[in-house]
Amino acid sequence: MARYIGPKCKLSRREGTDLQLKSGVKPFDVKTKKHAKAPGQHGQARGKQSEYSLQLREKQKVRRMYGVLERQFSNYYKEAARVKGATGENLLKLLESRLDNVVYRMGFGSTRAEARQLVSHRSITLNGRRVNIASIQVKAGDVIAVHEGAKQQLRIKNAIELAAQRGIPAWMDVDHSKLEGTFKAAPDRSDLPAEINESLIVELYSK
C-alpha cells in the first residue's frame, strides 16, 4: 500500500480526531471548521458502526497517526503479541520507539512526517552516527541529535518553538540548546495518547 500524500486534515476528519499530522500552529477545530463533516458525499451521515467497523477505524487511526504502512503495522502487531506483556500496550510502545516518532517527540520535527524526512535526509544522528532509517527502534539510553550540518535549518528552529508549547514527554531528556536528547525508557501506557483504544486493534487482529 502506497503512502498517502493527500490533504492531511482530510485524514483527521475521516477519523473524527486530530491525528497530529499538521504542525499544530492552529487548533484542530479551527483547521477543520470549514469542513467539519467527515469527507465524502455522505460525510455527515455517521450511522451506527458495526463492531468490525469500529475496530478497523481504530487500527486505521493509529496507523495513520504514526505514518506506518499496512504491512509494517501488521508486523508491529505480531512483534507486540510475541513479547511478554499486554499486546496493545506493547504495540503502542513499539510505535512510540520508532526513530521518526522520537525525533518528533523531542521537538526536532513539527510533525512525524517532517521528522521522518529529517531522518531520511540523514539530518539526525543516533549515538553519534548518522542514520536514515525512520523505523529504527530506539532503546533506553540512546542519544538522538541533529547533525551539525542541519542545525541551522529554519524548520528545526520552528519545530522547537512548537515543542515548547506542546511539551516534551517525561521519558525523554532533551536539551534544545544542543539539539540533542536521550531516550530514557519506553513510555508507560499512562504516558501515551488517551484517545487511542488499543483493545479494539487487538480484537481486530485476534479474529
Curated annotation (Swiss-Prot):
Q: Which GO terms describe its molecular function?
A: rRNA binding; structural constituent of ribosome
What does the UniProt keyword field contain?
Ribonucleoprotein, Ribosomal protein, RNA-binding, rRNA-binding
Start and end of every S4 RNA-binding domain? 97-159
Which cellular component terms (GO) are annotated to the entry?
A: small ribosomal subunit
Pfam families in alphabetical order = Ribosomal_S4 (PF00163), S4 (PF01479)
Q: Gene3D superfamilies, from UniProt?
A: Ribosomal Protein S4 Delta 41, Chain A, domain 1 (1.10.1050.10), RNA-binding S4 domain (3.10.290.10)
Q: Which InterPro entries match?
A: Ribosomal_uS4 (IPR022801), Ribosomal_uS4_bac-type (IPR005709), Ribosomal_uS4_CS (IPR018079), Ribosomal_uS4_N (IPR001912), S4_RNA-bd (IPR002942), S4_RNA-bd_sf (IPR036986)
* GO annotation (BP), single: translation
Region entry Disordered, spans: 26-53
Coiled-coil annotated residue ranges, if any: none
> What domain of life?
Bacteria
Subunit composition and interactions: Part of the 30S ribosomal subunit. Contacts protein S5. The interaction surface between S4 and S5 is involved in control of translational fidelity.
Q: In which family does this protein belong, per the annotation?
A: Belongs to the universal ribosomal protein uS4 family.
Its job:
One of the primary rRNA binding proteins, it binds directly to 16S rRNA where it nucleates assembly of the body of the 30S subunit.
Protein name from the UniProt record? Small ribosomal subunit protein uS4
Q: Which gene encodes it?
A: rpsD
